[in-house]
Amino acid sequence: MGSRRHKNKQAAPPTLEEFQARKEKKANRKLEKGKRPSTTQGDEVSDRKKKKSKPFKKSRKEEEEVVEEDKDLPEVDLEELSKARKSLFDDEEDDDEAGLVDEELKDEFDLEQEYDYDEDEDNDAHPIFSDDDDEADLEELNAQNMEALSKKLDEEEAEEAEEAEMELVEAENMQPRADILPTEEQEEMMAQETPNLTSTRTRMIEIVKVLENFKTLGAEGRSRGEYVDRLLKDICEYFGYTPFLAEKLFNLFSPAEAMEFFEANEIARPITIRTNTLKTRRRDLAQTLVNRGVNLQPIGSWTKVGLQIFDSQVPIGATPEYLAGHYILQAASSFLPVIALDPHENERILDMAAAPGGKTTYISAMMKNTGCVFANDANKSRTKSLIANIHRLGCTNTIVCNYDAREFPKVIGGFDRILLDAPCSGTGVIGKDQSVKVSRTEKDFIQIPHLQKQLLLSAIDSVDCNSKHGGVIVYSTCSVAVEEDEAVIDYALRKRPNVKLVDTGLAIGKEAFTSYRGKKFHPSVKLARRYYPHTYNVDGFFVAKFQKIGPSSFDDNQASAKEKETAARKEALEEGIIHSDFATFEDEEDDKYIEKSVKNNLLKKGVNPKAKRPSNEK
């Protein structure tokens, strides 16, 4: 069966050479037939037919033997046999193929068959799927209608994209969404089990999607606050923040951007160096470091002295160039306040919180070692690193001093420009110091802004408003908290009407907030600039620039640090820190804490707080 089917298969078509040979042979035969007489041709054909028509005759003995054998064999029903054959092999086409065998073989090997290739070429010229109709619909492209056709194509693409987006949104809306928030029973089980960070991260991503489109994706019976509370719990569990700090940072952004901010804080910022232009140029320094096996590139167009280090075959803080003072390791965000300060040559400038000296030495380099730079820091131990960097970088116009910055201008005043990089909570540099996640409390965001306000007022009073090009104060922090940034400069604008905020002149940065959680700030606060790790790949930073337009009162200039502290505390009590917006005080609750604190102090001294005290003791 298999061998017969194999033989019935049609062979491969003849090659071009074989076909040409057959065609020539056929033509020769026609010529030979034309030369032969017709009678002879007819006789040969008839003889051939006669020979073919004569059957082969068997002898009588053979016929008798065949008949006897047929009698001995049982009778076979051919129809049943054929049905059984079909059912066994399931080959219904065998009969049809058997009838076509002779014709196929004849077509394959008949040399007299003629192929009409002209007709095939005509058929190929008219394919089934033709683009003639589409080409007819299109207009002829020329210089006049090119713009119109291009616009039409753009509109069609926009419509298709919009339809696809609508279909996607409808599909999401129609598809039932599982409830993301766990039930109370599930939360109890989660509290007992080991935290699964993978499922926590997945849940955070899903909650952010819901919060971004709460009207459509929010589950029935669930409020937005429930989603936010669950997200904050997951942030504390996944990233390791305290609930207080997580909520404070979360409120600065939209849910999606807040997640980007938290993710960026898990990654350290790139290593950056600042070229010391007092000793070299950035191009020369880059070439030298590349020759030493350092992979680097310029930070960006906004700075002409910064280089970003990707990897190095040598310790970047111990190269001969580093020891010679050709560069200093400095965060890119620390360049920003000095660029905003824009120091000029032959000016008197004060850096109120100078250690470890990155900004001070940058100021000296921009002044080309002219004028005078006062580098002050209240912490005497930190002045050691300040002095070391000043000497290594070759700054000869710098004076190091160790004063409480609130003593200015009583100590010395009349500066052309002042840079105040105020001490802060460090919420912008969590990538460097992960301890900030758990070390900062609500108390820190009350005490630190209180100090920052006093320092900023002292800086304003220490600047000479009659300076030819100066009268500038730059306030900066490495914090992203509103209490330390917008609230402080808004306070300064209210307390010192002789200053105004001006443009920082920085090429990058986001506008500061003019309102935050119901608190309205001065409209000019938007001139200040904010920097986030997830937007510019720098540490979180805040920069504001003031211009002094009038003199301060005599009392403000002569006040000491203690007097300023007393005045600030009095103002804080009157205003409730920031007009009672960020912190409220309850006297009854405070009295309880005060009484408890007094008892604890007495117990530490070994005194029984319940015992009656003598009348002469207070």
Curated annotation (Swiss-Prot):
Enzyme class at the top of the EC tree: transferase
GO CC field: nucleolus; nucleoplasm; nucleus; preribosome, large subunit precursor
Molecular function terms from GO: RNA binding; rRNA (cytosine-C5-)-methyltransferase activity
Compositionally biased tracts (Acidic residues): 64-79, 90-123
EC numbers on record: 2.1.1.310
Subunit structure comment from the entry: Interacts with NOP53. Interacts with TRM112.
Protein name, as recorded: 25S rRNA (cytosine(2870)-C(5))-methyltransferase
Gene: NOP2
